[in-house]
Amino acid sequence: MIVIDKECEAVSRLFAKKSVRLKVPVGVKSENPIFQRKGSSFNLKSLREYQPFDDLRQIDWKLYGRTDRYYIKEFYEEENERFFLLVDSSASIPIFGRDYYLCFVASLAFIFLRLHFTLNMLSFTNRLESSCMNIKEHRAIPRVLGFLDSLEFNGRTDLVQVMQTVRERYQPTTLFLFSDLFDRRLTLEHLQGFRRVFLLHFFTPFSSLSLRHSEIEVEDRETRQRLLLPNNPVARREIESLERQFLGRFYRSRRGYHYLQLERTKERVPFYWRILETLYD
């Protein structure tokens, strides 16, 4: 059973009065004089054409009567972003800890829905596996939990291919990637093309492992290959050096790029707070 952190309700209330929404309305390109009227309420709103995912109740029927076209009126406080949550469901994730991982994703999604963001969730291995799209309002949290609970965690990771597919198919503005990043080919260049990326790295450091024998048998959950390694100071130093090289790819300062490293021993709530502070900055 996936449990949402109890602090999420309080965290979402604290940020509810802030705004990360668009500061200016979306312009409607039209020569119809109705959009040029001075002193009318139209100058205070964003107007856009109706799209299939919109609620029919949001259609401005008075405007339809004047223009014979369907428009949605959005007040400043109603405009929000659509976040894409890309969830790794490959076989290596349970090594980190399935419960911690799913709790984190579910809790962050809960907060976003409480703050009236729209979510699109995609799971992946070496390809996109499943989706749960256009999730709105906190009443839809059962959809999030059902989606996460259905993940099977098998198969290999191919982040390079998946990121390319997401970029070409969906063109998201803000992307949250939840993964252990088990793809040595992945670099920050593969994250270009997204205006804002949150890379949430679920990481198990080598130093946290309790190793008591002189040799270690390591199994790659994704390939099912086994490797026998010596457990001595020289071998440990070499592994830790490779680990630092691996992590070094992600410690970059770049506009719109945010890297957070999570470990099973770390509290989750401070990470929710950091993400929200970044969004509301």
Tell me the role of every PLM-derived stretch:
Residues N120-K136, F147, R156-Q164, S179:
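Short, surface-exposed recognition loops or helix-turn segments adjacent to catalytic cores
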Residues E137-G146, S253-Y259:
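Short, electropositive alpha-helical surface patch
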Residues M1-V26, S30-F35, E189-D281:
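Von Willebrand factor type A / integrin I
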Residues I93, V162-Y170, L186-F194, F250-R254:
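Alpha-helix C-terminal capping segments
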Residues M1-M133, T174-F176, R184, H190:
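An amphipathic, basic-hydrophobic helix/alpha-beta surface used to engage anionic
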Residues S89, L177-F182, F203, E263:
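Structural motif
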Residues R139-T174, R185, H201-T204:
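Von Willebrand factor
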Residues C103-S107, R143, Q245:
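Long, highly charged amphipathic alpha-helices
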